[in-house]
Structures are given as C-alpha cells and as structure tokens.
Curated annotation (Swiss-Prot):
Residues 25-568 are lumenal. GO terms for biological process: cell adhesion; cell division; trypsinogen activation. Localized to zymogen granules, where it functions in trypsinogen activation. May indirectly regulate cell motility, cell-cell and cell/extracellular matrix interactions. Disulfide bonds join C17-C58, C85-C107, C154-C180, C207-C229, C442-C498. Keywords: Cell adhesion, Cell cycle, Cell division, Cytoplasmic vesicle, Disulfide bond, Glycoprotein, Membrane, Repeat, Signal, Transmembrane, Transmembrane helix. Residues 25-146, 154-265 form the CUB domain. The lineage of its organism: Eukaryota, Metazoa, Chordata, Craniata, Vertebrata. It comes from Homo sapiens (Human). Gene3D superfamilies: Spermadhesin, CUB domain, Zona pellucida, ZP-C domain, Zona pellucida, ZP-N domain. It holds the Pfam family ZP-N. GO terms for cellular component: cell surface; extracellular space; membrane; zymogen granule membrane. This is CUB and zona pellucida-like domain-containing protein 1. Glycans are attached at N29, N57, N67, N394, N419. Detected in pancreas and epithelium of ovary. Expressed at higher levels in ovarian tumors than in normal tissue.
C-alpha cells in the first residue's frame, strides 16, 4: 500500500499529460514541422502537398549553402473561398524570416498562378488560416536556380500582328525546371487570338506539375484566362492588344511541350478609315460599312502593287511594308516619308463612261521627332479627307555576351563582375534597309528615371569613358562596349539610356556619317528622326551575394506558433512523461530489491 500511495501522484501526472495530447490531436491542428529541403547540396528541388487545418499559423524557411536563387510556385491553392485575404493567406518573404521584404501574398481571391523568386539563397513563406472548418489544400513546389544561366528559346517578346512560338526543344521533350514567359503585344485597337496546335504536358486534374498559364494582359498580374496541361488544343482570345503566356515545368515526366500560333483581330468599330504607322509598316483599316457605298466588300481594293492583297475579317486591313508593295520613300528637309495609294474602281459595262464613284486613298507616314506622324488622304469625287495620329519609333537595347553580338543576355537584373566588359546594342526594328542608326548620347544612372547622378559614356557621338569603345555604323544597329563600374554611396544598380539618330544611309553629309563631333559643331535640332532606349538594372555580383546569408546555412525549420500541436508545451510534456516512467521503473526495482535483501551479494572479507 505504501508503494501505491507513492506512485499515485506520478500516475495522475502521466494520465494528465496523455489527456492533453489526446485533446490536441482531436482538435485537428496540422503539424508545422514539415521538413523542407535545401541544406543538402544534392537537393535542388522539392514538391509537397499541404493539408491545412483551421486556425493555422505556420512559417517555413528554405535555405541553401550556395549562391543560388529560389523560385517557389503555388500551382494549386484551395483556401477558404469565403475568407478574407487578411484572415487567411500565404505570404512569401525574401530572406530568412517573416521580417524580410514581402515578395507577395496569396489568398482565395487571387486570379493568377503565384510564382515568387528570391534575391538570394533564402526564402520564407507563412500560411495563416481562419477558423472555418473546410478542406484546404496547397501544392508547393520550389527549386534552386542560377539567374545568370538561361534556357534557349525560353520566353521572349512578340510584337507582330501574327506569329508562332513553341516550348524549348520542341518537338523533343521540354527541359526540366523551366519557367518561360512570352509577352505578346500587337498594335492598338487589336485583340489577340491564340491557338495551340499541340499541347503535350504531364496530365494532372489540377495541372499542378507541368502547365501553361495564359493571362489577359501584358503581365502575369493581368488576370488568368486559363491554366492547361495534358493533351488539349484550346483557343484563347484577349480583351486588349496584349497577352502573356507562361510555361512552368517540374523535375520529372518531360514530354513534347507545345506549339502555338496567334493572329490579330481588329477590335474597334470605325466609320471610315484609320491609319497606323510603325517602324516597319503602315497599317490601314477600312470599315466594310464604308465600302458598301461602292458596292464592294474589299476584294477589289489594291495598293500600287496589285499583288499585295488585303486581309478580310470584320474590317478590310492592309499591312503595307515600308520597303514593298509600291511604297515610295522620300527624303526632304531632314525628314523621311513613306507613301502608298489604295485604289478601287467598280466594274463598268462601258469603257468610256461610268456612273460609279471612284475611290482613292493616299496613305503617308512621316518620321517625326521621337515619333512617327501619320497622315491619310481620302479622295472621293474630288472630296479630300484627312486624319492625323502619332506613334513612336520601335527601337530596343540589349546586352550581349561578346563582341560578336550573337547571343542576347536575357537576365534581369544582370549580375556582373566589377570591370567586366559589357557589350551593348541598340536595334531599330524596321523593314526599310536604307536607314542607319547612330549613337549620339549614352549615359548611366543608378535609378531608372535618370535623375542625378548620371555618368556619360558617349556624348555627341564621342566616347567619354576611357573603357568605352563605339563601333562603326552598322545598318539598323548601334553598338558599343564598356567596362562595368559601380556608383558610389552603395548604389547597387546601373541603368543605361541611349539617344540615337536615324539617318538615310545614302546621305553622306548626314549627322550619322560625321561621327564624333564637338559640342560647338554639332547641330541635330533639325533632325526629326531621333529616339532613345533604356536597359537595366545591371548589378555587381558581390552586391547580390551580400544580400544573402554568409556562413553555413542551417537545416530548414518551422517557426513555433501557439497553434502547433508539437510546440514547446507538448515537447515539455513528453519530457516529463519520459522522466516519470524512468522514475517509476527505478522505484519499482528498488522496492523489489529491498524485499529480497537476503539474496544480496556481499563483499568478501580479505584474509
């Protein structure tokens, strides 16, 4: 009885601990101690399905002892549809804790596939749920990647009225761990019709693994039209003149990928005729209702070159190249103009007289100051109508890997070593072969608005930096190189801006052919065709590594919260339970030993 009396308090304590653990399990709080990979150098990716419970608050940190970035994708998110973004969400932070910069937030109201990228080798995400008792499922997939390594043909910019593109390696298996973004943008007043000729991606009901995401606008924040995978051939139509397509793949089951094409559909209703000028063509839109007065549906309309035919849809559309279809190019008073004529004459039973209206549409594009001026003349029985509009030159600037200017660098931001040679090219996108690009001024700035401070690399066509080399005139391309530098006062980014002149290549007296000219001699005010391009940011590699953690990265862990069933209180309970078991066992053994003391071994006396 004495033994029972002594053991009773310990027994009650053990039962109390067990009851506490049983109650915690009955409440259904999910464990936040999911083991995320990353500390192991051999592990480059991880996927997991999280089954979340009410009143959850969990935080995970992904780390890797290597200078790589992390891309995390939430390809399937099922949260409380009635919950607010404040009470139930997923937050992603750049760094080792939730105190780092917020990369973004995910909730049930989001209309996109959430994808986030860290600036260094650490990333943290936190999941908070409300008290509603519903099913919640989140598929999380992340992997480590090097921003300075790109996959060929993975994404790009498409700006023609029609075109096609495919997944990398198509029709061979697509690459693993790929994230490709294609931006499609056509001229104003058009919509985009996207048609997938083939899609062969991993089949999954929720498209969690390999998928295509189509967005109705210029970015992945524009609104999701569809997320597809498997073996389907869907068609999508934008509501504006831009569309974004994303391909995301995981680490297994690579198939053929996809093949897609797109066309443009004129979206606006017009009463007569409109004209749009770009760097390589004139685009004329004629209303079919306007042509009804001529008993025509557009089939009898033609340019100066009758072999150039219009495209017939809900409107009649002419795409007139600046160097074809009979377009006349003229240089006068430091100005370049392009002119063509659209004519129509109804068939007549007599070769002498006609009682039908005659139609002649004169279209003219004039290159102006940092823009193109569009003029259209319509003559109908000696009545002339005119319309004016404004556009801009189509120029772009890019970095290249070498002085061969063959392989473009697509990373942004682009991380470089101090004093590394950078190769820059400004391109004029036009079909006119008789134009040449001249680099007038190029400068650098630590900010994208080019406020103070700025640093001149090229001015008046002359190199202002000892490492800067300007290449000779080369058609539609202006090229130069310089060595990477950093602005003082810890400004990590560098942006480049170039102002260029566009000249007639046959004019040997043009400013472009004069090369480097001192300020007192230069005069470009009369030049109407000039424009500028911007690229950036460029950052030093040491700035990138400094933003991450130094030293050995510890194992990925979960922060402890009050809602975790295996928090410090429960851990302490387990320790008490184990200690009590050991104590009970010790007392029991000692009790039985004391009861049989006569069988003890005794030390023999020495003789």
């Amino acid at each position: 009885m004495e033994l029972v009396r002594r053991l009773m308090p310990l027994t009650l304590l053990i039962l109390s601990c067990l009851a506490e653990l049983t109650m915690a399990e009955a409440e259904g709080n999910a464990s936040c101690t999911v083991s995320l990979g990353g500390a192991n150098m051999a592990e480059t990716h991880k996927a997991m399905i999280l089954q979340l419970n009410p009143s959850e608050n969990c935080t995970w940190t992904i780390e890797r002892p290597e200078n790589k970035s992390i891309r995390i994708i939430f390809s399937y998110v099922q949260l409380d549809p009635d919950g607010s973004c404040e009470s139930e969400n997923i937050k992603v932070f750049d760094g080792t804790s939730s105190n780092g910069p917020l990369l973004g937030q995910v909730c049930s109201k989001n209309d996109y596939v959430p994808v986030f990228e860290s600036s260094s080798s650490t990333l943290t995400f936190q999941i908070v749920t409300d008290s509603a008792r519903i099913q919640r499922t989140v598929f999380v997939f992340y992997y480590f990647f090097s921003p300075n390594i790109s996959i060929p043909n993975c994404g790009g910019y498409l700006d023609t009225l029609e075109g096609s593109f495919t997944s990398p390696n198509y029709p061979k298996p697509h690459p693993e761990l790929a994230y490709c973004v294609w931006h499609i943008q056509v001229e104003k007043d058009y919509k985009i019709k996207l048609n997938f000729k083939e899609i062969f991606l991993e089949i999954d009901k929720q498209c969690k693994f390999d998928f295509l995401a189509i967005y109705d606008g210029p970015s992945t924040n524009s609104g999701l039209i569809g997320q597809v995978c498997g073996r389907v051939t869907p068609t999508f139509e934008s509501s504006s003149n831009s569309l974004t397509v994303v391909l995301s793949t995981d680490y297994a089951n690579s198939y053929r990928g996809f093949s897609a094409s797109y066309t443009s559909i004129y979206a606006e209703n017009i009463n007569t005729t409109s004209l749009t000028c770009s760097s390589d063509r004139m685009r004329v839109i004629i209303s079919k209702s306007y042509l009804e007065a001529f008993n025509s549906n557009g089939n009898n309309l033609q340019l100066k070159d009758p072999t150039c035919r219009p495209k017939l849809s809900n409107v009649v559309e002419f795409s007139v190249p600046l160097n074809g279809c009979g377009t006349i190019r003229k240089v006068e008073d430091q100005s370049i103009t392009y002119t063509n004529i659209i004519t129509f004459s109804a068939s007549s039973t007599s070769e002498v007289i006609t009682r039908q209206k005659q139609l002649q549409i004169i279209v003219k594009c004039e290159m102006g100051h940092n823009s193109t001026v569009e003029i259209i003349y319509i003559t109908e029985d000696d009545v002339i109508q005119s319309q004016n509009a404004l556009g801009k030159y189509n120029t772009s600037m890019a970095l290249f890997e070498s002085n061969s200017f063959e392989k473009t660098i697509l990373e942004s931001p682009y991380y470089v070593d101090l004093n590394q040679t950078l190769f820059v090219q400004v391109s004029l996108h036009t079909s006119d072969p008789n134009l040449v690009v001249f680099l007038d001024t190029c400068r650098a700035s630590p900010t994208s608005d080019f406020a103070s401070p700025t640093y001149d690399l090229i001015k008046s066509g002359c190199s202002r930096d000892e490492t800067c080399k300007v290449y000779p005139l080369f058609g539609h391309y202006g090229r130069f190189q310089f060595n990477a530098f950093k602005f003082l006062r810890s400004m990590s980014s560098v942006y480049l801006q170039c102002k260029v002149l566009i000249c007639d290549s046959s004019d040997h007296q043009s400013r472009c052919n004069q090369g480097c000219v001192s300020r007192s001699k230069r005069d470009i005010s009369s030049y109407k065709w000039k424009t500028d391009s911007i690229i950036g940011p460029i950052r030093l590699k040491r700035d990138r590594s400094a933003s991450g953690n130094s030293g050995f990265q510890h194992e990925t862990h979960a922060e402890e919260t009050p809602n975790q069933p295996f928090n410090s209180v429960h851990l302490f309970s387990f320790m008490v339970l184990a200690l009590n078991v050991v104590t009970v066992a010790t007392i029991t053994v000692r009790h039985f030993v004391n009861q049989r003391a006569d069988y003890k071994y005794q030390k023999l006396q020495n003789y």
